[in-house]
Structures are given as C-alpha cells and as structure tokens.
Amino acid sequence: GMGLANLLYAPVLLLLRNVGLLTRSRSERDVLLDEPPQGLYDAVRLRERPVSGQDGEPRSPPGPFD
C-alpha cells in the first residue's frame, strides 16, 4: 500500500524539483508584456468617488458591480 505509493510518488518529485529554476523564453516574456490586457481587465474599471457617504460617515469604495 504505502510502499507502492512512495515508489510511484518519488520519481514525480524528482522530475518536479527543478521546475522553480525554469525561466520563460525571452520571446514569450516580450509577448506577455506587449499585449494589452483583455477580457475582464477591460470590463472592470475603477471609478473615482468620494469615500465618505453623504452623512460624512466613511464607507467602502465601490466594487466592480456597483
């Protein structure tokens, strides 16, 4: 049971140990930085509003669905 799980799990850990050292290629990094944001990032825009309410009490800033 557990011995078999360890024998199958250990090679996966050995393959994944260097994943953090991998870097993106230069061309992929340039493409990601050059493209404008798409989708939800375009739809959600912050609007400037006074943070205090009409009665002077502080309130939370508006959310994306206000």
Curated annotation (Swiss-Prot):
A GO biological process held by the record = neurotransmitter transport
Q: How does it sit in the membrane?
A: Multi-pass membrane protein
Question: Region (Disordered): which ranges?
Answer: 43-66
Transmembrane helix as a keyword of this entry, yes or no, is yes
**TM ranges:** 1-15
Cellular component, GO, one term:
synaptic vesicle membrane
Q: Which reaction does it catalyse?
A: acetylcholine(out) + 2 H(+)(in) = acetylcholine(in) + 2 H(+)(out); choline(in) + 2 H(+)(out) = choline(out) + 2 H(+)(in); serotonin(in) + 2 H(+)(out) = serotonin(out) + 2 H(+)(in)
According to its UniProt entry, the function of this protein is described as:
Electrogenic antiporter that exchanges one cholinergic neurotransmitter, acetylcholine or choline, with two intravesicular protons across the membrane of synaptic vesicles. Uses the electrochemical proton gradient established by the V-type proton-pump ATPase to store neurotransmitters inside the vesicles prior to their release via exocytosis. Determines cholinergic vesicular quantal size at presynaptic nerve terminals in developing neuro-muscular junctions with an impact on motor neuron differentiation and innervation pattern.
State how it assembles.
Interacts with SEC14L1.
The protein's name in its UniProt record: Vesicular acetylcholine transporter
Q: Gene of origin?
A: SLC18A3
